[in-house]
Regions:
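Active-site-proximal alpha-helix that buttresses catalytic centers in soluble enzyme cores
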Residues: 1-262
Length: 262
């Protein structure tokens, strides 16, 4: 990343560390770096990327590098949910970094979570599926499934249900359900079979994932298999969140919250 700074005095000695999970698929890691670069342009200060596992640099290594050039680092999580990594792994790494660099102020931010920009992005993903299937929520019965990876953490799963409910509110969907590809219930297959009983005109299955990885592929396959099994219901999968600019809105808000303790 460039060592860009702003003319605002309070930001001249500050940097952001965007923490992604890390993957064996380099494409997924590049997504984190791409978002870091775009966030740097948005905020006008240095933004570096770090990873929890499977990719480099690790959090401690990245913070050590930043400690040489700035006096304040705000850690921002590129995580959809507040599961164990957000609740345990990152805070531990931040605590250790504070001990290693007592001269450095390190702020630990929140995960992406539930945010109006994400709801807007999900709505657009559904609209793209409607266009593909030739249906319109105002004239046709369109059901939506928001499908996430599933977690052993109840807070993470609750966020998916909340997102599905908020996506339904104020929009003309027939129904909007939360489902999961593993770990917890309801699983995608059972959710789709339950929806089929009501015979909607179309079902849009939206992967609540950042990238187009293995789990996103399973979600898309599940939607296509359902479409083949139920000829009286048109179904198709949407795209994951990707690197849409609206994620920068969320990350920018999480950065501001982290550095101001709000």
């Amino acid at each position: 990343m460039s060592e860009a700074t702003t003319s605002t005095e309070t930001l001249q000695d500050e940097a952001v560390l965007l923490v992604g999970h890390g993957s064996r698929r380099e494409k997924s890691n590049e997504q984190v770096r791409e978002l870091a670069s775009e966030l740097e342009g948005r905020l006008g200060l240095p933004v570096d990327a770090a990873f929890l596992e499977l990719a480099e640099p690790a959090i401690d290594e990245a913070i050590a590098g930043l400690a040489r050039t700035v006096s304040q680092v705000s850690v921002v999580h590129l995580s959809l949910f507040a599961a164990s990594h957000v609740k345990n792994d990152v805070p531990l790494a931040v605590t250790q970094a504070r001990e290693a660099h007592p001269e450095l102020t390190i702020n630990n931010g929140a995960h992406l979570g539930v945010h109006p920009a994400i709801l807007d992005l999900l709505d657009d993903r559904v609209a793209a599926v409607e266009a593909e299937l030739g249906v319109d929520r105002t004239d046709d019965e369109v059901a939506v499934v928001v499908c996430a990876r599933g977690s052993s953490d109840p807070d993470a799963n609750a966020d998916v249900h909340k997102l599905a409910r908020l996506l339904y509110e104020g929009r003309e969907f027939g129904r909007c359900e939360a489902s999961f590809i593993g770990v917890t219930e309801p699983l995608l297959d059972e959710t789709l079979h339950d929806i089929a009983k009501t015979r909607p005109d179309a079902v849009a299955v939206v992967p609540y994932m950042l990238g187009d990885g293995v789990l996103t592929g399973r979600i898309k396959d599940g939607a296509r298999e359902f479409d083949a099994e139920y000829p009286y219901v048109d179904a198709a999968p949407g795209e994951p969140l990707g690197t849409d600019n609206r994620l920068l809105d969320v990350l920018g808000d999480r950065w501001q919250e982290a550095r101001t303790d709000s």
